[in-house]
Amino acid sequence: ADADLVEKMRGGKTGVVGVMKFSRPGKIVAFRFDMDCNDVEECDTADHRPLENGFQSLHAKEMHACGHDGHVTIGLGLAKLISEYKEEMAGTIKLIFQPAEEGVRGARAMVAKGIVDDVDYMFGGHIGFKATKSDSLVCLTGGFLATTKLDASFKGESSHAGAAPERGRNALLAAAASCI
């Protein structure tokens, strides 16, 4: 890869937002598609369809597993579909192609940039394993394959069972309890 381009992307600056403003006023609706590759070794057996058809990752241990290539395809397909009906549309549509979903950094960076500040409705999706048939769509409002990371500090105070046990503050117990 071009070293200058890689440097510009350092820190997760690889997100893309397509904004489609229509002539009639209306709500701002956003659709989010994650697009990061994962640290996964792709199969290299002769019967592996991506290898067989020439679209396997060129980089070892970097592949768009977890459906992320499908998410990008869905996003681009939605953009094409919307553009075909642009005369009938109102408001604004934002197509958010988010990097770093797996490491929980991409959404935070895009939110910090103000990309979703004006959004009235937000839709996100993830190719997954809830559907029972290949031609099915499962809609949920919960956190399917969602994650959040946070840092927490627990401070305690040591004591002795025979000398003022009531002064003890068990940080380890608090930390363990917060995990369950």
Question: Model-predicted segments: where are they?
Answer:
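Acidic/His- and Gly-rich active-site-bordering loop/insert found
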Residues: 1-64, 73-77, 81-89
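Histidine/acidic-residue-rich, glycine-tolerant segments that coordinate divalent metal ions
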Residues: 16, 56-63, 69-70, 82-180
